[in-house]
Amino acid sequence: MPLFDLKSPYPPAGDQPQAIEALTKSLKNNNHYQTLVGVTGSGKTYTMANIIAQTNKPALIMSHNKTLCAQLYSEFKAFFPHNRVEYFISHFDYYQPESYIPRRDLFIEKDSSINDDLERLRLSATTSLLGYDDVIVIASVSANYGLGNPEEYLKVMEKIKVGEKRAYKSFLLKLVEMGYSRNEVVFDRGSFRATGECVDIFPAYNDAEFIRIEFFGDEIERIAVFDALEKNEIKRLDSVMLYAASQFAVGSERLNLAIKSIEDELALRLKFFKEQDKMLEYNRLKQRTEHDLEMISATGVCKGIENYARHFTGKAPNETPFCLFDYLGIFEREFLVIVDESHVSLPQFGGMYAGDMSRKSVLVEYGFRLPSALDNRPLKFDEFIHKNCQFLFVSATPNKLELELSKKNVAEQIIRPTGLLDPKFEVRDSDKQVQDLFDEIKLVVARGERVLITTLTKKMAEELCKYYAEWGLKARYMHSEIDAIERNHIIRSLRLKEFDILIGINLLREGLDLPEVSLVAIMDADKEGFLRSETSLIQTMGRAARNANGKVLLYAKKITQSMQKAFEITSYRRAKQEEFNKIHNITPKTVTRALEEELKLRDDEIRIAKALKKDKMPKSEREKIIKELDKKMRECTKNLDFEEAMRLRDEIAQLRTL
């Protein structure tokens, strides 16, 4: 029986049918690795969706940054509205890991800020994987970091049935063991409240509904689901599955084993420091670890509990830690891993382990942590790439690694469903690049189209932006210090024609889906290096491939080897696309992609609240607006529009102070 229900108004077109068929066949033949080489705008995401639907396996889609993850999440939610599409990225808004600098004798405490919504989405992903098969998880590099033991997580979950016998007090204790906290005042995610014989539980993985369990003596009489905002009953249930409030939750038996294991390791390490006559490290480790043990014994958690993860999961020293892959592969289930933009993602995954190990080794050496802290780590690259699953690498410019691993299992997707061609390109002398480009920009802007310019330095981007602004052009620049939310805002503003020219350094390559852009300019294209490599040039040139007037200008004094290879590949693709269009009588058309409604207009609720004199508003009216804003805020959070959600949250807070 099919697991996935793929919805799309269009059938596969261009090169999509043959790519879907070839890669699905390869996967069904149990090949471990395969690669999709797909040009920009060829519909790689739709091809991925079709492959998932046809292979009928849970899937993990990994990307190298949060912006692309959010984009993929939105697209797959639309493709699979009736399936469980989940989102799993880092839950930290801010993260400063603990570290020690010996030469300065400086210990830096861990400092972090957890995003409650991202934490909920992570929990939703793991609970879906443990309860269902029709799951697609969109994940960042976070998928490679350690999690709790999924089998222990299953032991902690509870199935609650109407009519079953349960002692009321022991049920409350079980909720605490599952990581829920009792709070009669602030009732939100991961908490419960008990009044009389009624227990309300707010699941940690759901912010829209809470569960009410009604007892009659020691028997469960009624189970109901309530809307968290309206507080009205949605439905009654005969039974409900309740999952733990944390991925690291363990039962009391495992907790006691972990405490004993930590104590044993501490004794061995203290003996080592004593024999080495390192009494400073001895006392430091003894004090810190014994304090943590007291907290774990009393509450089940402590600050930095992740450093003891190996003891809680039951793993041996140096053994591969549990991670999201183990939740996908629970019950020996087969699953598919798709690595999007693999030419960037795989090198990023490969560099994670070394940096983490370097920092923690110093902490262990100087007595800040037990050696087991080294086992709370991301996967090594070999562990990742040899996971017991199937891999599909997706990129317009795959590296040698992907192609070697995939051998003959490589599919090309060069023909676009829209008939669009790879852009024309032209090399011009870099001596007068600024003025020459100025003349080209005026022509593009006059047509109502946009321009992307990539430079080698932040300073040049700033100066170029300032220069063109002085000449009356609307330009902005983007650099690495701009966060993801502001980056999205800039891209949206470009599409809305609030400005016409976007200038950047390394931010214009992957994932920019901008059909309004018809001109891409690459300054100093002959300066060999990472930013002007064959891969980077092809990716950057591809940004002009979503517009029928797409054109690339490369400013240089000479043609480098990287430029020559990029030109050969682009010319090969363009020739193949032109031939296909001629045979099938296709006229290239610019991609049309609707701007999201919320980008054009502020929410009506916000405008109303701001227009009214809130301090004179009747309380009942104010409460009504708060309720509407709160509902909208939750919808924005669910759609990963955190910027709008934060704005709504602030509006609600302001109204509540009146």
Swiss-Prot record:
<protein>
    <recommendedName>
        <fullName>UvrABC system protein B</fullName>
    </recommendedName>
</protein>
<keyword id="KW-0067">ATP-binding</keyword>
<dbReference type="GO" id="GO:0009432">
    <property type="term" value="P:SOS response"/>
</dbReference>
<feature type="domain" description="Helicase C-terminal">
    <location>
        <begin position="433"/>
        <end position="607"/>
    </location>
</feature>
<dbReference type="Pfam" id="PF12344">
    <property type="entry name" value="UvrB"/>
</dbReference>
<dbReference type="GO" id="GO:0016887">
    <property type="term" value="F:ATP hydrolysis activity"/>
</dbReference>
<dbReference type="InterPro" id="IPR027417">
    <property type="entry name" value="P-loop_NTPase"/>
</dbReference>
<keyword id="KW-0267">Excision nuclease</keyword>
<dbReference type="InterPro" id="IPR004807">
    <property type="entry name" value="UvrB"/>
</dbReference>
<dbReference type="Pfam" id="PF00271">
    <property type="entry name" value="Helicase_C"/>
</dbReference>
<feature type="short sequence motif" description="Beta-hairpin">
    <location>
        <begin position="91"/>
        <end position="114"/>
    </location>
</feature>
<comment type="subunit">
    <text>Forms a heterotetramer with UvrA during the search for lesions. Interacts with UvrC in an incision complex.</text>
</comment>
<keyword id="KW-0234">DNA repair</keyword>
<dbReference type="InterPro" id="IPR001650">
    <property type="entry name" value="Helicase_C-like"/>
</dbReference>
<dbReference type="GO" id="GO:0005524">
    <property type="term" value="F:ATP binding"/>
</dbReference>
<dbReference type="InterPro" id="IPR041471">
    <property type="entry name" value="UvrB_inter"/>
</dbReference>
<dbReference type="InterPro" id="IPR001943">
    <property type="entry name" value="UVR_dom"/>
</dbReference>
<dbReference type="Pfam" id="PF04851">
    <property type="entry name" value="ResIII"/>
</dbReference>
<keyword id="KW-0227">DNA damage</keyword>
<keyword id="KW-0963">Cytoplasm</keyword>
<keyword id="KW-0228">DNA excision</keyword>
<comment type="similarity">
    <text>Belongs to the UvrB family.</text>
</comment>
<dbReference type="GO" id="GO:0009381">
    <property type="term" value="F:excinuclease ABC activity"/>
</dbReference>
<comment type="function">
    <text>The UvrABC repair system catalyzes the recognition and processing of DNA lesions. A damage recognition complex composed of 2 UvrA and 2 UvrB subunits scans DNA for abnormalities. Upon binding of the UvrA(2)B(2) complex to a putative damaged site, the DNA wraps around one UvrB monomer. DNA wrap is dependent on ATP binding by UvrB and probably causes local melting of the DNA helix, facilitating insertion of UvrB beta-hairpin between the DNA strands. Then UvrB probes one DNA strand for the presence of a lesion.</text>
</comment>
<dbReference type="GO" id="GO:0003677">
    <property type="term" value="F:DNA binding"/>
</dbReference>
<dbReference type="InterPro" id="IPR014001">
    <property type="entry name" value="Helicase_ATP-bd"/>
</dbReference>
<dbReference type="InterPro" id="IPR036876">
    <property type="entry name" value="UVR_dom_sf"/>
</dbReference>
<dbReference type="Pfam" id="PF02151">
    <property type="entry name" value="UVR"/>
</dbReference>
<feature type="domain" description="UVR">
    <location>
        <begin position="623"/>
        <end position="658"/>
    </location>
</feature>
<keyword id="KW-0547">Nucleotide-binding</keyword>
<dbReference type="GO" id="GO:0009380">
    <property type="term" value="C:excinuclease repair complex"/>
</dbReference>
<dbReference type="GO" id="GO:0005737">
    <property type="term" value="C:cytoplasm"/>
</dbReference>
<keyword id="KW-0742">SOS response</keyword>
<feature type="binding site">
    <location>
        <begin position="38"/>
        <end position="45"/>
    </location>
    <ligand>
        <name>ATP</name>
    </ligand>
</feature>
<dbReference type="Pfam" id="PF17757">
    <property type="entry name" value="UvrB_inter"/>
</dbReference>
<dbReference type="GO" id="GO:0000715">
    <property type="term" value="P:nucleotide-excision repair, DNA damage recognition"/>
</dbReference>
<dbReference type="InterPro" id="IPR024759">
    <property type="entry name" value="UvrB_YAD/RRR_dom"/>
</dbReference>
<feature type="domain" description="Helicase ATP-binding">
    <location>
        <begin position="25"/>
        <end position="414"/>
    </location>
</feature>
<dbReference type="InterPro" id="IPR006935">
    <property type="entry name" value="Helicase/UvrB_N"/>
</dbReference>
